[in-house]
């Protein structure tokens, strides 16, 4: 087995019972692939598919003028290079975007020509605004902040059939409805009312009988009835009435007369129910007609107009009910044959027939006018307007788009559905198979007449009791709109606005000799894009607390947003877990608040298909044998198969074992024989999301607690020294690498140079491109602020001389340790009560943990100050500030900006700024002072940037931005100079490395070769030696050597050109950088200068901080106890944390107990390894012990492939504790945990005996740190990976003495952000009332709150030393009086 360079250093012992068939896919693929498909930068202009930008342009262009003689055609588009790179955009607060230019062709036709003739073609490039670019990690930089476009899970376009579940009508009758949802355009609804009449409505407007729509589509009454009904023919004669015998219609009917065979024998007696046997007898008897009573004709509806063949008189119209009078009329006129609609109460209802009777519109035009009046009430219906509106509703590509998905969904639900035998022979089968044959193939992206009729027919058939309604929560009916598609829609809407403006101007294009760029104004496009990325509900400020929160945010799918649900209207069904979520959407990870179930996370292996439906992978099973073939199935496809679980037992050949296997079929769990199984899950963790799959022993946790665990891992603050979890799940490495927090090698090579800021790798010859210099330079991110103010800092994980392969770890980032996600610290935990300090989930923690900086984190705050141009003059950033103490000034440089490295506290000046003050009337004293001391100090006020209250830290960076045309101060200039110097050093280093690498390659290439001549009198035919090369004055002279081998000579020339090119590139890059830095900055209007100060704040763990494990076991630190008072073990080691044992049973998150036991084993194994290393045991003994660890149970590791040195390095990395992986749903069993505990703490070891273990080695004797006595019973002790969450008491607690007031109520503001005070609310008043503390209450409600006069008076009294209270009227009472007056009630106060 091949281990990577990093994996060798610390192999994670996995307890997985099954081989991993499919690697965890790239976790950000959804975002990155979607946007790449939108931009199509990789494809040549002519190879671009009709997706993304290309599709948007194609849908709007060509734009034709109103007169038809000019048109604009789209040729292709190009994206330029972004002006600034990502870090520069973040610093300057601008958007990381590239200019979009489209090649547009203006075609002008000849007006005089008889047929369309091109008169003139003008073509040029048109600037279409800027398109934000995605960063390599799947986010966007918008106005300097990283944002994520969350994917949306919305209802798929298509046709959906449902019923109201009996909720609308009191009788509980099911009212069926259908809805045709397009991607863009009007919604068309069909619905039954309680009287079984069928209505339609457009865009949820007023409902109308559905026959109006059918008439508007061109059908008359007879045609409508012909579509929706089977017919019955009755033959009238003097002997009675007969009808054609249709056997299928007789079943379940009662015989109205005796049914006789040809011999006169009774087959079914009158009044008897006709059974299936009777039908067989009737068919065998060869009867073709049946006698019926004349009364049975009454109430039936005629299928067609009855016309007297002689006179042409219409005796009765289609859909007329047959009455006694009508029968008499038929008799008089000698009608021998009538055709009626076949209707029965059971499965052929009279819905359309009855609806037609309520519809009074005469024909096609009248129906269209009725629809126009409903859509545009109050507007006069002219013939042209009526036609235009009706066509634009569903039949125009400009205003209606069903989309490819919608058409596919529509066809599969209507034309391509499987029909039963009875349906095949009915009107419905004839309609789909004969009348509308081929309609599915020709269906475009607009609706056709056939589509509307087929939808109505399917709804009627549903009401008749045939077929199933759709489940709208099924993932086959919900699709994912990712970032590319969302951006495309915005871009298209912007282009549509451009189109309207262009059409107006196109008529003048020829006369005014305009070019395409004169016609097109790109502002609407860039405004639409800007609005979407800046303020859309789906464009969210990226959660960047730690790498997991980044990855999870990018994998989120939301049902909210434009075109989606709203949290107020979403019911339980939408939020609930659905069987189709299996392997697609995580059933665990979702927010706890009002958004529960509306915001979900993609499962680990889920992906979207071309239509936007979620798919999950399965292994194919053939005849009970599981193959290596993997198919991705969508929720619709999955319903057709029987699927076994990933943990089904297999033999060595991959055959399913056992008589019955647990499977899923159509969302139900069943037991099936192995030969029925068609697919099998690829992995046990396929069901859950990334965050949930990071929880070890998830299978032993209650779902509610697992949900909290998954959510709280995203809030874990990166610690100063990240520590890998001893008990993990094996997916930690994927998260660290895919989040781009940890850096991996792009190409294999040898590490040439390492320092804290960069790593240089000389690429292997076989991976370097021929003739190119192979060097990769990785610049590390140092102390950068994340969106949540946490610290992003990368640390090199390699040494000079290390040999790396592609994909090996180069540097660790925040919250990663040796390329694995490390969100918290491994803590030794005891479950026991301790003096009530762990009551209600409180956490008792050792002082040693805080002193060792285990949970110390660095937070970086950014503070800004701007100098504006005011009416009274420009604000000035300066050191010369009135009334500023010497101590404060010492921290500022001559420009008035704080030094880097200064330690600052609340109230300290960071940037000195003065603002001109309005001239005021001076008192004589002030005039005197001005005359003596000059006038500078008095006409400006101090508006400096000061350190906010409750904050202290170290200044780590300062950035100064100056508007174009304003002279830079010394500090700004020195920042630019140092930046340029650093950049030049970087470039020089790169060039030096390139040079060294190139000349090393040349040396290997030419030493030993024959030369034709060269410098220092190298003769023809002589061999080139290392000594000769070393003796040349400069290495660049090597290029003058003439080689006999022509191929080598060419390669030498290529390297020379490559080096020259690199040098030129470096100079060019330096000039670009210089230009960027020296040009003025784009600042907001009126702003002359902006200074950003970055402050690093060190937050140590303290009482009040929130902490949690990975199983939803959260709590608040109640006390940090001196280490000598903590409970300790027999060997003197104190525990780190004491948790409450009562927090476990009721919460049912037993996973934490198993984690603690396995962590205890990991720690014990680490201690044994540490002892062996200290005793300098041989590598063979270490290898033997590691073999017991890795190859006892679970997944086997190939330790034989490691050298002795690698074994020793592996062992030294396990000193603090072994690394275990317990994959989700395939984790360590109890027996395996016991095995590890026995390996860690062998019974024969005297050290182990001293600890006082119980039989299972899960509990030990602990001693009270204060008294030294042993506790009464043994205590569960172990190691748990514990996290510090981003709810720090420092950020929550604040105190106010005086501060801002609300102007209206005169009461203090609330909240830390407003520096508010505490509210003495209604319930607090009740408490004082209950105690009868009248004076305290009066004081609270008046002088201490909003009694303005009373407050002033109180201050005066205190100053004078008179301790008495003069309470007045609270301002809030005045507000109440005003409120009552505003309602028109006069209220006055009368004084007594």
UniProtKB/Swiss-Prot annotation:
Designated name of the protein: DNA-directed RNA polymerase subunit beta
Matches recorded under Gene3D superfamilies: 2.40.50.100, 2.40.50.150, 3.90.1100.10, DNA-directed RNA polymerase, beta subunit, external 1 domain, DNA-directed RNA polymerase, subunit 2, domain 6, RNA polymerase alpha subunit dimerisation domain, RNA polymerase Rpb2, domain 2
Species of origin: Neisseria gonorrhoeae (strain ATCC 700825 / FA 1090)
Chemical reaction(s) catalysed: RNA(n) + a ribonucleoside 5'-triphosphate = RNA(n+1) + diphosphate
Any GO molecular function: ribonucleoside binding
InterPro entries, per database record: DNA-dir_RNA_pol_bsu_ext_1_sf (IPR042107), DNA-dir_RNA_pol_bsu_external_1 (IPR019462), DNA-dir_RNA_pol_su2 (IPR015712), DNA-dir_RNAP_su2_dom (IPR007120), DNA-dir_RNAP_su2_hyb_sf (IPR037033), RNA_pol_bsu_bac (IPR010243), RNA_pol_bsu_CS (IPR007121), RNA_pol_bsu_protrusion (IPR007644)
Function: DNA-dependent RNA polymerase catalyzes the transcription of DNA into RNA using the four ribonucleoside triphosphates as substrates.
Record EC number: 2.7.7.6
Keywords: DNA-directed RNA polymerase, Nucleotidyltransferase, Transcription, Transferase
Annotated PANTHER family: DNA-DIRECTED RNA POLYMERASE I SUBUNIT 2
Family recorded in the similarity comment: Belongs to the RNA polymerase beta chain family.
NCBIfam families the UniProt entry points to: PRK00405.1 (NF001616), rpoB (TIGR02013)
A Gene Ontology term for the protein's cellular component: DNA-directed RNA polymerase complex
Encoding gene, per UniProt annotation: rpoB
TM stretches of this protein: none
């Amino acid at each position: 087995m091949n281990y990577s360079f990093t994996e060798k250093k610390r192999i994670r012992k996995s307890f997985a019972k099954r081989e991993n068939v499919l690697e965890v896919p790239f976790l950000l693929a959804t975002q990155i692939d979607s946007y790449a498909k939108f931009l199509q930068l990789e494809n040549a202009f002519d190879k671009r598919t009709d997706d993304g930008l290309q599709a948007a342009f194609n849908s709007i262009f060509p734009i034709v003028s109103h007169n038809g003689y000019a048109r604009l055609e789209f040729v292709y588009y190009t994206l330029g290079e972004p002006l600034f790179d990502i870090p520069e955009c973040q610093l300057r607060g601008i958007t990381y975007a590239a200019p979009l230019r489209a090649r547009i062709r203006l075609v002008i036709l000849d007006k005089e020509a008889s047929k369309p003739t091109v008169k003139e073609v003008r073509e040029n490039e048109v600037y279409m605004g800027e398109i934000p670019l995605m960063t390599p990690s799947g986010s966007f930089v918008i106005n300097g902040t990283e944002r994520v476009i969350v994917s949306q899970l919305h209802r798929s376009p298509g046709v959906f059939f449902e019923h109201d579940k009996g909720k609308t009508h009191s009788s509980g009758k099911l009212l069926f409805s259908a809805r045709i949802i397009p991607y863009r355009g009007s919604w068309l609804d069909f619905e039954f009312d309680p009287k079984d009449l069928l209505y339609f409505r457009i865009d949820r407007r007023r409902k109308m009988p559905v026959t109006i729509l059918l008439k508007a589509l061109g059908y008359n009454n007879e045609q409508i009835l012909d579509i929706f009904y089977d017919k019955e023919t009755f033959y009238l004669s003097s002997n009675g009435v007969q009808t054609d015998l249709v056997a299928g219609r007789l079943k379940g009917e009662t015989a109205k007369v005796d049914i006789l065979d040809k011999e006169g024998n009774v087959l079914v007696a009158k009044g008897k129910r006709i059974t299936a046997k009777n039908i067989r007898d009737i068919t065998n008897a060869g009867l073709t007609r049946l006698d019926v009573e004349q009364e049975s004709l009454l109430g039936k509806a005629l299928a067609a107009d009855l016309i007297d063949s002689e006179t042409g008189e219409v005796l009765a119209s289609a859909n007329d009910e047959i009455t006694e009078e009508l029968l008499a009329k038929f008799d008089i006129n000698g009608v021998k044959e009538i055709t009626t609609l076949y209707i029965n109460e059971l499965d052929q209802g009279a819905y359309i027939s009855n609806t037609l009777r309520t519809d009074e519109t005469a024909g096609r035009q009248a129906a269209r006018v009725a629809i126009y009046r409903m859509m545009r009430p109050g507007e006069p219906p002219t013939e042209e307007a009526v036609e235009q509106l009706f066509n634009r509703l569903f039949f125009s590509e400009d205003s209606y788009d069903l989309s490819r998905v919608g058409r596919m969904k529509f066809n599969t639900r209507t034309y391509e559905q499987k029909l039963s035998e009875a349906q095949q022979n009915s009107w419905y089968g004839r309609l789909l198979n004969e009348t509308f044959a081929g309609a599915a193939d020709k269906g475009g992206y607009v609706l056709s007449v056939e589509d509307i009729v087929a939808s109505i027919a399917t709804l009627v058939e549903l009401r008749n009791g045939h077929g199933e309604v759709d489940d709208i929560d099924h993932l086959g009916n919900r699709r994912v709109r990712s970032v590319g598609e969302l951006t495309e829609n915005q871009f298209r809407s912007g282009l549509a606005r451009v189109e309207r403006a262009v059409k107006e101007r196109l008529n003048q294009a020829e006369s005014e000799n305009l070019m395409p760029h004169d016609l097109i104004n790109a502002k609407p496009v860039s405004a639409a894009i800007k609005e979407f990325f800046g303020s859309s509900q789906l464009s969210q400020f990226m959660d960047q607390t730690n790498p997991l929160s980044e990855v999870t945010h990018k994998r989120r799918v939301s049902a909210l947003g434009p075109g989606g649900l709203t949290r107020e209207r979403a019911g339980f069904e939408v939020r609930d877990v659905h069987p189709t979520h299996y392997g697609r959407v995580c059933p665990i990870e979702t927010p706890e608040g009002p958004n529960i179930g509306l915001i979900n996370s993609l499962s680990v292996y889920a992906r979207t298909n071309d239509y936007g439906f979620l798919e999950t992978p399965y292994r194919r099973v053939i005849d009970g044998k599981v193959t290596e073939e993997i198919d991705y199935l969508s929720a619709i496809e999955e319903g057709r198969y029987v699927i076994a679980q990933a943990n089904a037992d297999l033999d060595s050949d991959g055959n399913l074992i056992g008589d019955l296997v647990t499977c899923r079929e159509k969302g139900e769990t069943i037991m099936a024989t192995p030969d029925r199984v068609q697919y099998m899950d690829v992995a046990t963790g396929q069901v859950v999301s990334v965050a949930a799959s990071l929880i070890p022993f998830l299978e032993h946790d209650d779902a509610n607690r697992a949900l909290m665990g998954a959510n709280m891992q995203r809030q874990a603050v990166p610690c100063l020294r990240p520590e890998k979890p001893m008990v993990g799940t094996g997916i930690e490495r994927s998260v660290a690498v895919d989040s781009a927090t940890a850096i991996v090698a792009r190409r294999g090579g040898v590490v040439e140079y390492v320092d804290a800021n960069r790593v240089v790798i000389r690429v292997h010859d076989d991976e370097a491109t021929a003739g190119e210099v192979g060097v990769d330079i990785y610049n590390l991110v140092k102390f950068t602020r994340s969106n949540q103010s946490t610290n992003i800092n990368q640390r090199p994980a390699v040494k000079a001389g290390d040999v790396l392969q592609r994909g090996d770890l180069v540097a660790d980032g925040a919250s990663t340790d040796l390329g694995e996600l490390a969100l918290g610290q491994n803590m030794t935990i005891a479950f026991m009560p301790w003096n009530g300090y762990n009551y209600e989930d409180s956490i008792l923690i050792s002082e040693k943990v805080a002193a060792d900086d285990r949970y110390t984190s660095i937070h970086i705050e950014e503070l800004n100050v701007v100098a504006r141009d005011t009416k009274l003059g420009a604000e000035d950033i300066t050191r010369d500030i009135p009334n500023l103490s010497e101590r404060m000034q010492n921290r500022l440089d001559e420009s008035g900006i704080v030094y880097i490295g200064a330690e600052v506290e609340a109230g300290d000046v960071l940037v000195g700024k003065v603002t001109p003050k309005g001239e005021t009337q001076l008192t004589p004293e002030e005039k005197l002072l001005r005359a003596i001391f000059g006038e500078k100090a008095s006409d400006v006020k101090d508006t400096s940037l000061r350190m906010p209250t409750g904050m202290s830290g170290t200044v780590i960076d300062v950035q100064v931005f100056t508007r174009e045309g304003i002279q830079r101060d010394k500090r700004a200039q020195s920042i630019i100079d140092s930046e340029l110097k650093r950049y030049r050093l970087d470039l020089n280093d790169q060039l030096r490395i390139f040079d060294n690498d190139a000349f090393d390659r040349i040396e290997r290439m030419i030493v030993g070769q024959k030369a034709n001549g060269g410098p220092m009198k190298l003769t023809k035919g002589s061999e080139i030696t290392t000594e000769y090369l070393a003796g040349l004055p400069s290495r660049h002279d090597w290029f003058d050597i003439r080689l006999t081998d022509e191929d080598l000579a060419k390669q030498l020339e290529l390297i020379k050109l490559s080096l020259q090119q690199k040098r030129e590139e470096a100079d060019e890059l330096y000039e670009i950088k210089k230009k960027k830095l020296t040009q003025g900055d784009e600042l907001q209007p009126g702003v002359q200068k902006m200074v950003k100060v970055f402050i690093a704040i060190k937050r140590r763990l303290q009482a009040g901080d929130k902490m949690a494990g990975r199983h939803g076991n959260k709590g608040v630190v109640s006390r940090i106890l001196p280490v000598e008072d903590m409970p300790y073990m027999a060997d003197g080691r104190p525990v780190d944390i004491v948790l409450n044992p009562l927090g476990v049973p009721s919460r049912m998150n037993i996973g934490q107990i198993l984690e603690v036991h396995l962590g205890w084993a990991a720690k014990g194994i680490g201690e044994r390894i540490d002892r062996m290393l200290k005793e300098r045991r041989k590598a063979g003994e270490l290898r033997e012990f590691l073999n017991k660890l890795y190859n006892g149970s679970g997944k086997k590791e190939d330790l034989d492939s490691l050298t002795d040195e690698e074994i020793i390095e592996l062992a030294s990395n396990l000193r603090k504790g072994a690394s275990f992986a317990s994959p989700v749903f395939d984790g360590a069993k109890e027996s395996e945990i016991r095995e590890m505990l026995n390996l860690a703490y062998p019974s024969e070891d005297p050290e182990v005996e001293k600890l006082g273990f119980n039989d299972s080695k899960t509990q030990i004797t602990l001693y009270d740190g204060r008294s030294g006595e042993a506790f009464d019973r043994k205590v569960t002790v172990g190691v748990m990976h514990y996290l510090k969450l981003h709810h720090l008491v420092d950020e929550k607690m604040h105190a106010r003495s005086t501060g801002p007031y609300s102007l209206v109520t005169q009461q203090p503001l609330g909240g830390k952000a407003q520096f508010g005070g505490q509210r003495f609310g209604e319930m607090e008043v009740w408490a004082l009332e209950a105690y009868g503390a009248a004076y305290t209450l009066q004081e609270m409600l008046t002088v201490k709150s909003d009694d303005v006069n009373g407050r002033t008076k109180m201050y005066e009294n205190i100053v004078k030393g008179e301790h008495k209270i003069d309470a007045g009227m609270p301002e809030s009472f005045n507000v109440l009086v005003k409120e009552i007056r505003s309602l028109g009630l006069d209220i006055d106060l009368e004084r007594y």
